[in-house]
């Protein structure tokens, strides 16, 4: 299922079909893998971009696609949604008997980025939308009389977090603005022009915004602003609040879940903290030996399911029982993310378990180092990763994107290192500072530390 805005999603929900949302940026090889892995037999897409052409190319090798439907245009070999829909009854007959829809039936499947293999297929059931009520009501705090604006490509789970299910359940008006290239100034203009009341975007968006003259825009309609997708640097939290008076409410979750941790209504955010567990999830921190951590002890974020899976938690990785068992066993779902509780019950993000750097016997999370670098006024964004080191095993590398046309010089390197040596322990000091024009990101805006690390480690192997 492909649609820039997913207006046909409500039809799909009513008839009980299983959907696989996808971005319109996919190419032939992407479709081939997704068709085969998901046993796809029908596709619905808009005329945006080269989607239909790439699908036709993929169908040269994949022969099980029975139905191809295009919305808003026509193409040889495709059925026209606009032409054919008028022939169907406007009265909906709910499926019954063996075709009846049950809450535990598969409903929607997401291809979620793989770190060591092809994307996994995260499968949710028809109770999944109910899990997003907390997301919209108590985190986004959507107003039934207001307008909610969330930035996310509709091919990703975050779009259902921020644009559809929870917001519908809360009777919110959803603002949709399609763009091919992100322009923070245009987003701010939209907020001002249409009097947006609640806004959600990845941290990358706010990192760009804080370097703009925000006082040139009337943002007085905004009642609540939220962010998720990756950890929010405290420096961005403080700068955004200083410039707008608005408090960024950070949240955490995965494609496999709904909002799991967040700064919810009634809580007082701590800059840099993800917030507290949401009521529907029993969140714990687990140590490598399988015991539960105490306050200030770093470990993996896990969700206890001994009393059953909460609404919003996925069913399985479709077609891969081994991956499902690896992630969900002994009464816990293992997120693969590391964090710790403080004494007040707030959670602080450390990194992905595979992002943690092991240097000279120390376990080092990248986020703390990134936060210190982000405090410098000339830094737009950064990523901390590991590189091979013959003595330490792994050394620390910081890849830095500079703001406002600043040039990366040896003098600037010295200035950054001087700041780091003043503010963080010596075992966390980067060995390498690399200035780069941009960082690799996923389509949804997350920094791909994994890609930076793999390139460096592969380069080291080639040089040996």
Describe each PLM feature range.
Residues 1-7, 11:
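Single conserved hydrophobic/aromatic residue that forms the stacking wall/gate
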Residues 14-84, 195, 404:
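Structural core segment of the AMP-binding/adenylate-forming
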Residues 16, 130-150, 154-197, 212:
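Conserved AMP-binding/adenylation subdomain of ANL enzymes
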Residues 26-36, 43-48, 199, 305, ...:
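AMP-binding/adenylate-forming catalytic core of the ANL superfamily
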Residues 70, 76, 86-111, 118, ...:
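Conserved pre-ATP/AMP-binding loop-to-beta segment of ANL
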Residues 280, 291-326, 364:
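Conserved ATP/PPi-binding loop(s) of AMP-dependent carboxylate-activating enzymes
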């Amino acid at each position: 299922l492909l649609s820039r805005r997913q207006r046909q999603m409500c039809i799909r929900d009513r008839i009980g079909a299983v959907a696989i949302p996808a971005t319109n940026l996919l190419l032939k090889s992407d479709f081939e893998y997704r068709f085969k892995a998901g046993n796809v037999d029908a596709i619905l897409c808009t005329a945006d971009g080269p989607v239909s052409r790439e699908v036709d190319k993929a169908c040269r090798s994949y022969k099980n696609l029975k139905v191809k439907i295009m919305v808003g245009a026509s193409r040889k070999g495709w059925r026209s949604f606009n032409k054919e829909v008028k022939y169907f009854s406007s009265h909906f007959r709910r499926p019954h008997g063996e075709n009846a829809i049950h809450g535990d039936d598969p409903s929607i499947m997401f291809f979620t980025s793989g770190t060591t293999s092809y994307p996994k297929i995260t499968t949710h059931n028809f109770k999944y939308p109910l899990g997003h009520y907390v997301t919209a009501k108590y985190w986004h705090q959507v107003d039934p009389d207001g307008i909610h604006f969330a930035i996310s490509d509709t091919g990703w789970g975050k779009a259902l977090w921020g644009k559809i299910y929870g917001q519908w359940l809360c009777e919110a008006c959803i603002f949709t603005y399609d763009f091919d290239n992100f322009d923070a100034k245009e987003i701010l203009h939209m907020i001002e022009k249409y009097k947006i009341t609640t806004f959600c975007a990845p941290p990358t968006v706010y990192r760009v915004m804080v370097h703009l003259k925000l006082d040139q825009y009337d943002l007085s309609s905004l009642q609540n602003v939220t962010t998720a997708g990756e950890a929010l640097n405290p420096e961005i939290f403080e700068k955004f609040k200083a410039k707008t008076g608005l408090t960024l409410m950070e949240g955490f979750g995965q494609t496999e879940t709904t909002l799991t941790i967040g700064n919810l209504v009634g809580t007082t955010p701590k800059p840099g903290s993800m917030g507290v567990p949401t009521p529907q999830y029993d969140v714990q921190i687990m140590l490598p030996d399988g015991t539960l951590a105490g306050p200030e002890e770093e470990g993996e974020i896990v969700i206890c399911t001994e009393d059953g899976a909460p609404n919003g938690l996925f069913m399985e990785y479709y077609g891969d029982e081994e991956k499902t068992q690896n992630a969900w066993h002994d009464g816990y779902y293992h997120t693969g993310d590391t964090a710790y509780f403080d004494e007040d019950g707030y959670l602080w993000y450390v990194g992905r378990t595979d992002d943690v750097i092991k240097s000279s016997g120390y376990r080092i999370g990248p986020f703390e180092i990134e936060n210190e670098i982000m405090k410098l006024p000339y830094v737009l964004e950064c990523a901390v990763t590991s590189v091979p080191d013959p003595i330490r095993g792994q050394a620390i590398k910081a890849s830095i994107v500079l703001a406002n046309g600043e040039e990366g010089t040896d003098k600037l390197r010295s200035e950054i290192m001087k700041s780091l040596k003043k503010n963080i322990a010596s075992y966390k000091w980067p060995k390498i500072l690399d200035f780069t024009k941009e960082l690799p990101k996923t389509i949804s805006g997350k920094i791909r530390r994994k890609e930076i690390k793999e390139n460096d480690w592969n380069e080291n192997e080639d040089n040996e």
